[in-house]
């Protein structure tokens, strides 16, 4: 029996869909064409959770998400790291030797360049990896293949003719688990935690330098600091940051106190358990 619905951006069979299934096997994944629609589904309660990609070890941050996140009204309650693997799939009965063209989203084609070059395939760009599999299923073509996650082959009745064809095998995407709850239950104190927050410093000389000082003097490990322009204004820069620990920790509480003294805007977006993947070498 389903334990609720979880929103993601993309087609059924996408990497985000696989992440939903792996992390929340009892929930029903719900696909949305855009990140805006996925966020809206969470906010309205149509979906209880969201699985949102924020960065990839090769491609970098997902810019659309970082611009939506600070003003979304949602909270972060978890993170998941997912190794990314791409499969070459065809219509049933098609032999690899017959394939002349491969379709997928541009970033997937780029990350499988070695295999594509070795097989001497032409490329065709589509907006989503799973969409390439869906289109191939709907319009069978013995000369065409798709690059997509394994789940897409299962959903759309395709056959995998080459597995894990990505050039770099440490390709990993980080996802955030989102909720519309204003005050979600705090993570257990037995778990290492991450705190995500946004802030905008006051308009004064060296404000950012001074705002950051409390993290150094209190021994708080900041793992991420990224700047963004708000509403297209070059003078209204705000920052997204992540630190190890939780606001109840004395060291982080002191660092936040100093940060807020030099900031005109500050909001904690979430306190959540650190994924064990972080400790892997």
Where are the language model's segments positioned?
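Domain-level signature for soluble enzymes in the chorismate/prephenate branch of the shikimate pathway
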Residues: 1-281
């Amino acid at each position: 029996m389903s334990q609720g619905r979880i929103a993601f951006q993309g087609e059924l069979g996408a990497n985000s869909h696989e992440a939903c299934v792996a992390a929340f096997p009892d929930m029903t994944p719900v696909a949305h064409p855009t990140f805006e629609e996925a966020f809206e589904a969470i906010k309205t309660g149509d979906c209880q959770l969201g699985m949102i990609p924020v960065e990839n070890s090769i491609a970098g941050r997902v810019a659309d998400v970082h611009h939506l996140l600070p003003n979304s009204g949602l909270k972060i309650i978890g993170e998941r790291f997912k190794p990314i693997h791409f499969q070459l799939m065809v219509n049933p009965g098609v032999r690899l030797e017959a394939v002349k063209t491969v379709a997928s989203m541009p970033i997937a084609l780029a990350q499988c360049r070695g295999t594509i070059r070795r097989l001497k395939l032409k490329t065709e760009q589509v907006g989503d990896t799973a969409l390439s599999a869906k289109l191939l299923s709907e319009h069978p073509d013995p000369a065409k293949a798709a690059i997509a996650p394994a789940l897409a082959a299962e959903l759309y009745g395709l056959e995998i003719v080459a597995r894990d064809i990505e050039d770099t095998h440490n390709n990993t995407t980080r996802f955030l688990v989102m909720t519309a709850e204003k005050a979600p239950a705090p993570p257990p104190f037995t778990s290492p935690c991450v705190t995500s927050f946004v802030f905008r410093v006051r308009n004064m000389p060296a404000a950012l330098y001074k705002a950051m000082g409390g993290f150094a003097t209190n021994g708080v490990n900041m793992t991420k600091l990224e700047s963004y322009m708000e509403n297209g204004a070059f003078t209204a820069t705000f920052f997204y940051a992540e630190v190890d620990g939780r606001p109840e920790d004395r060291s982080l509480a002191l660092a936040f106190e100093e940060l807020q003294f030099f900031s005109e805007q500050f909001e904690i977006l979430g306190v959540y358990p650190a994924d064990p993947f972080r400790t892997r070498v």
